[in-house]
Swiss-Prot record:
Protein name per its UniProtKB record: Alpha-N-acetylgalactosaminidase
Gene name for this UniProt entry: Naga
Keywords attached to this entry: Disulfide bond, Glycoprotein, Glycosidase, Hydrolase, Lipid metabolism, Lysosome, Phosphoprotein, Signal
A GO term from the CC aspect: lysosome
Modified residues (Phosphoserine): 322, 332
Stated family: Belongs to the glycosyl hydrolase 27 family.
Keyword set includes Lipid metabolism: yes
Gene3D superfamilies (UniProt xref): Aldolase class I, Golgi alpha-mannosidase II
Organism per entry: Rattus norvegicus (Rat)
Localization: Lysosome
Subunit structure as annotated in this protein's UniProt entry: Homodimer.
Binding site for substrate: 78-79, 154, 188, 213, 217
Residue pairs linked by disulfide bridges in the UniProt entry: 38-80, 42-49, 127-158, 187-209
Amino acid sequence: MLQKTVLLLALVAQVLMLENGLLRTPPMGWLAWERFRCNINCEEDPKNCISERLFMEMADRLAQDGWRDLGYVYLNIDDCWIGGRDATGRLIPDPKRFPHGIAFLADYAHSLGLKLGIYEDMGKMTCMGYPGTTLDKVELDAATFAEWKVDMLKLDGCYSTPKERAEGYPKMAAALNATGRPIAFSCSWPAYEGGLPPKVNYTEVAGTCNLWRNYKDIQDSWKSVLSILDWFVKHQDILQPVSGPGHWNDPDMLLIGNFGLSFDESRAQMALWTVLAAPLFMSTDLRTISPQNIDILQNPLLIKINQDPLGIQGRLIFKSKSHIEVFKRNLSDDASALVFFSRRTDMPYHFHCSLLELNYPKGSVYEGQNVFTGDIISGLHPETNFTVIINPSGVVMWYLYPVKGLGIYTMMSQL
């Protein structure tokens, strides 16, 4: 009953959300921050510094290596691109690292079928100390980004007060809309207010932003992934209703392809972010990423689930004494995704369960697929016991859909 109530609230809440027609499914793309941070030493490290070259090379990889065609279309600049403001107050990029300007990068991205995102901060300075967007500069900066043909703005919240943020984020949303250019708006607003009511009014946030950071920045470690997941689970009854087409909770970037996650942990982050209907922003070096990590990030069924048009955020539905957790996301056409997640740190665990225990209704027969192995699930009745073998800190993920009129069933006992 609780799950049905939350689903109803989610559908009602969507009527109150920002409707600029953008991001009807969670955005996908590449974002510089986690992997490249604020590396501005282009003399010592020209290949990896925050520069025009870096973003053009990542754009090439997105276009040529299959990413764009799967939906990874955003190429997002983060902090440390700004050179200052000119005599009229307009933002200018660093002239040495971005010699051709941001409009040039936008044109380059667009020529490859990509979209360009940019970063600023609702405060006197960005988090790394570059000129921010103060309240008196909101309209000017919005007009500048539109003139540069930018497609997304991430607006951080360092060096600002709660009062400035409460005024500034809605003001920027209005200013972006006034430009006439479709610019998706990514906000850090809730994260700076603690992420929860009463300090955060999610109805107002969702009426202002297309996506928003709720919690701490992700770091390149499994501990960081778990801390974010735990926070989302603890507050899922608050967070789930406000997420949906055009307005998404953002647990932060994907770490896959970097240094802090094992293979199973990488699969787990991808599966869990997918079931949370999270934006999928990679932040890795696409020039050197391994085939193994490409397979995780380019898994077509995972992407299909993430991009489901209903846009319902999944939730934790079952927690066992054996430290196995089950997450479910409801999808279009009565389909669903299940993630069996192991919190164990010892050895692969045989988890025994049935769909009935997971509150699937009697009277249906289900078919589907193991998302990572491709194994087919056929003729599964809710009453049927099954076993999944889950690696430590790993996942098994299923895509299921009901098949009507099927009176007999067969199924592999272990998937």
